[in-house]
Amino acid sequence: AGARQTSFYQRDPWKRLIRTLSLQNSVTFGTIKEADESANRINKLHEVIKGEDEVTGKIYDALDHDQLLWVHACLQVSSIFFFEKTVRKLSENEKDMYHKENMLSAKLVLIDENKMPQTHKELENWVIDLTRRKQFLLITDVANDVKSIIQTGPVPRHIKPIWPFISFMAFHTLPEEFRNLYGVNQKKWHKKVVNINLSILRITRPFLPPFFRLIPPARWAKQRIKNRPDLQFKQKSKI
């Protein structure tokens, strides 16, 4: 409903994605000042996103705590899932360490740490329980729009050749509940292709140079920690 209200994702989905990633990366990899500024900007944007959902008739509010926590939790669970599929398995202690560190960014976007699950496993179970709740997940016009955008790929020309593969992997790494919702019929050969490609990433990654192993904001943050303490995210980012 919030996406329908802004509708920016329809006018320029790629620009919307880049802007969202830029703000998120600034919170994660920027200086303390930059993280605070980006979080404040996110919070300001969220202040005006509220109303009545046309599909369910329920009230939505981008500053509602449960809705904020849902987005945060899905991002965290997805991040750890992808890391374990393409890098290595994490111990429960490592996952909890990430969870505790991630709570800092959650607080910046107005999520109450005292109302959050206190371990990664608890957070993951919270997400799973909600997805299995009847009528919690619905396919709406907005969800179908996003599905179409991912399938057709209105992306820069240099990315277009690999976009069908990215789209395929995006849909076929979704949890079963989400695949069913989007009508993604995963056959055995689909699963094989996914597993083979994830295995290739996991095997080859250690041998790749940092340019390919790390996203740019992570490399810039590493530079700042090692020898450039004054380096700011906005100085390097062209987003």
Please report, for each region that a protein language model flagged, where it lies by residue.
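Mature, function-bearing regions of proteins
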Residues: 1-239
